């Protein structure tokens, strides 16, 4: 392929990926289906269910048009190929054009099926119909969902492509093409996985993401998974009526302090160990009085300057957890990105030390 063809292909590929997965920059620029078709979609706050009935249909149609958009663009980017005359184009391009035309045709057929009988065939409407009373329809359930979504006390989190919403009665997950709904009174929630991510856009501390399986007692309601930050776990539990079970070996860090303690411990493990003289016996930690003292402060930096680390002459008196809690308690809660690089006074002699000075006792 020549240069204009390559340039357009790469540019369109980037645009298509960003249009489907919508990063923050595209949201800020308004290049989303929700923003471009806001006049037809209406307001999510005013009518949650009708909004998402139309949004999922519009999203499916817009995304199905992307291959056709690429073909039309290539008609101008590679005009020498005469792609605007399908009968004269190579077999490969004719096959691509056929696929590009079939996708929106299939999408339109599916959307037409969904919209029959006032959207009664839409997957969201069919799920809501499972919770309808014998003499009422899914619209009555949708009205209840709309009312609860308008309340300010709902729990809402997640990125636009995977939002989690919990109201007084409903647990919902809003994705690009679908809205999962389950009623709180008959769901079983299980934390199936806890993933630790070392990089955070807001701080140098790790982020723990929890995966929770939401399964309804009604077998006709498909189960789904929600993901959220572990720091939001407590708020989620307050909104839920049903308890959340945890799978074996899943440890949940519900606060920033929990995440810091884990990072603090991992850094101490790579520091040089401190060998206790044979004549010295280790006593119980003076912080918790429950475990044996396990760390010693040993100055590692060589330069002596104002505000830098100082030598601590205290014997091992603290366990790793208590020392980590002391270190965290001396930090600015609004600046977690500075915690690991800061220096704090020894809890006993007040000599200043950093994380690199905390050595495990051997």
From Swiss-Prot:
Protein name: E3 ubiquitin-protein ligase TM129
UniProt entry tagged with the keyword Coiled coil: no
Cytoplasmic compartment segments: 28-56, 116-362
UniProt topology in membrane: Multi-pass membrane protein
One GO BP annotation of this record: protein ubiquitination
Catalysed transformations (reactions): S-ubiquitinyl-[E2 ubiquitin-conjugating enzyme]-L-cysteine + [acceptor protein]-L-lysine = [E2 ubiquitin-conjugating enzyme]-L-cysteine + N(6)-ubiquitinyl-[acceptor protein]-L-lysine
Gene Ontology cellular component list: endoplasmic reticulum; endoplasmic reticulum membrane
Lumenal topological intervals: 1-6, 78-94
UniProt domain comment: The RING-type zinc finger domain is responsible for E3 ubiquitin ligase activity.
GO molecular function, one term: zinc ion binding
Primary location: endoplasmic reticulum
Assembly with partners or alone: Integral component of ER-resident dislocation complexes.
Top-rank taxon, per record: Eukaryota
Annotated zinc fingers (RING-type), start-end: 285-350
Enzyme class (EC, first level): transferase
Annotated TM spans: 7-27, 57-77, 95-115
InterPro entries: TM129
UniProt keywords, alphabetically: Endoplasmic reticulum, Membrane, Metal-binding, Transferase, Transmembrane, Transmembrane helix, Ubl conjugation pathway, Unfolded protein response, Zinc, Zinc-finger
UniProt function note: E3 ubiquitin-protein ligase involved in ER-associated protein degradation, preferentially associates with the E2 enzyme UBE2J2. Exploited by viral US11 proteins to mediate HLA class I proteins degradation.
């Amino acid at each position: 392929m020549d240069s204009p063809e390559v340039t357009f292909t790469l540019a369109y590929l980037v645009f298509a990926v960003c249009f489907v997965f919508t990063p923050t920059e595209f949201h800020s620029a308004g290049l989303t289906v929700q923003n471009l078709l806001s006049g037809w979609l209406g307001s999510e706050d005013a009518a949650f269910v009708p909004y998402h009935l139309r949004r999922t249909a519009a999203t499916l149609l817009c995304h199905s048009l992307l291959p056709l958009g690429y073909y039309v663009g290539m008609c101008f980017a590679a005009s020498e190929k005469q792609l605007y005359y399908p009968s004269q184009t190579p077999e490969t391009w004719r096959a691509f054009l056929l696929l590009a035309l079939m996708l929106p045709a299939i999408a339109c057929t599916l959307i037409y099926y969904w919209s029959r009988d006032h959207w009664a065939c839409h997957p969201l409407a069919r799920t809501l119909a499972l919770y309808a009373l014998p003499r009422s329809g899914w619209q009555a359930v949708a009205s209840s969902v709309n009312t609860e979504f308008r309340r300010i006390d709902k729990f809402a989190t997640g990125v636009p492509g995977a939002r989690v919403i919990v109201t007084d009665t409903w647990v919902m997950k809003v994705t690009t093409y679908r809205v999962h709904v389950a009623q709180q009174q008959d769901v079983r929630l299980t934390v199936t996985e806890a993933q630790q991510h070392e990089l955070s856009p807001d701080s140098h501390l790790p982020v723990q993401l929890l995966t929770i399986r939401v399964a309804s007692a009604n077998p006709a309601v498909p189960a789904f998974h929600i993901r959220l930050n572990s720091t939001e776990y407590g708020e989620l539990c307050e909104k839920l009526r049903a308890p959340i079970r945890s799978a074996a070996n899943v440890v949940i860090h519900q606060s920033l302090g929990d995440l810091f303690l884990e990072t603090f411990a991992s850094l101490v493990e790579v520091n040089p160990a401190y060998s206790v003289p044979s004549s010295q016996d280790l006593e119980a930690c003076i912080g918790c009085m429950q475990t044996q003292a396990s760390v010693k402060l040993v100055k590692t930096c060589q330069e002596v300057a104002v505000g830098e680390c100082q030598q601590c002459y205290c014997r091992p008196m603290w366990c790793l957890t208590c020392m980590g809690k002391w270190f965290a308690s001396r930090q600015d809660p609004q600046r977690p990105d500075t915690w690991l690089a800061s220096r704090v006074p020894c809890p006993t002699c007040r000599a200043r030390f950093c994380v690199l000075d905390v050595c495990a006792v051997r």
